[in-house]
């Protein structure tokens, strides 16, 4: 059964997710506090008149810096004990997008994906060339080992193969532009060089001002094969709400590939939708008139 939270909104709006899956014991409170902080960071951009693109990047960067999420610092490790990160961003006005895959020494891959978008030469960069771009844009670079937390190392030593999660955000700004961003450390124990849906435009991330924006979380290979976010946005035209569109897309994923996942969406008017077919997915939403982020699960 799809589990969901929906939003009625017009004007600026923001939704942030911390990844669909099964939470480990003791993580619930920390993960919900994390998505709430991320939503407040993104909302601060929107409240100051900033762009949807800047808002989703700021929100996701907060989660990349939080070791309770599988993105940036604290990500799961590859089969040989390294961190390799994927991320993507997209803005819906000009359909500009940027993505990076299998990067190893960048603190915030979502900001590196933004650099790819800003340069506009490519949509996706993988590995060492992406690190070169980070140097050119003055982005914070760290030793690869600095991204590994003791908890992640212990899980790797136990060969804990729990599915990797993903973080992401969608937003609409006061000018009516929409954007989405997604970031992940990928699957625990993955082979080096594996790139998942978080770096694939149309699968894990998409934005179009005429329709809306979405960020997905779940099994990357299945999400890529379906093109999950594009499926969800295609359903928006006929759906009664963004949540209904998200549910419909997740039903397609389940029916065709037997996979469970989660989605956050905004339509072109800033009405938010949240749905999941997994045991948990912490989400925080922010809308005009609300004093603080609303947690949805």
Listing of model-derived features with the role each one plays in the protein:
Residues 1-297:
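Alpha/propeptide regions of enzymes that mature by internal proteolysis
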């Amino acid at each position: 059964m799809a589990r969901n939270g929906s939003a009625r909104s017009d004007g600026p709006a923001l939704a942030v997710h911390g990844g669909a899956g099964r939470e480990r014991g003791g993580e619930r409170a920390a993960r919900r506090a994390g998505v709430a902080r991320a939503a407040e960071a993104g909302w601060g951009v929107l409240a100051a008149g900033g762009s949807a693109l800047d808002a989703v990047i700021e929100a996701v960067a907060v989660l990349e810096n939080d070791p309770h999420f599988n993105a940036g610092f604290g990500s799961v490790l590859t089969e040989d004990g390294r961190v390799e990160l994927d991320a993507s961003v997209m803005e819906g006005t000009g359909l500009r997008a940027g993505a990076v895959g299998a990067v190893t020494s960048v603190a915030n891959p979502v900001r590196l994906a933004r650099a790819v978008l800003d340069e506009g030469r490519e949509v996706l960069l993988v590995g060492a060339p992406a690190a070169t771009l980070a140097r050119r844009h003055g982005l914070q670079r760290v030793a690869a080992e600095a991204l590994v937390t003791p908890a992640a190392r212990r899980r790797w030593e136990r060969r804990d193969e729990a599915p990797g999660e993903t973080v992401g955000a969608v937003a609409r700004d006061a000018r009516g532009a929409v954007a989405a961003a997604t970031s992940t450390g990928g699957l625990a124990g993955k082979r080096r060089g594996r790139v998942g849906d978080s770096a694939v435009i149309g699968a894990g991330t998409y934005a179009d001002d005429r329709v809306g924006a979405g960020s997905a979380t779940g099994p990357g290979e299945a999400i890529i094969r379906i093109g999950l976010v594009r499926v969800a946005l295609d359903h928006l035209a006929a759906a009664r709400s963004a949540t209904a569109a998200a549910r419909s897309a997740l039903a397609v994923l389940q029916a065709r590939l037997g996979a469970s996942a989660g989605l956050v969406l905004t339509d072109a008017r800033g009405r938010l939708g949240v749905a999941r077919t997994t045991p948990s997915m912490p989400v925080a939403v922010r809308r005009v008139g609300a004093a603080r982020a609303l947690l949805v699960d």
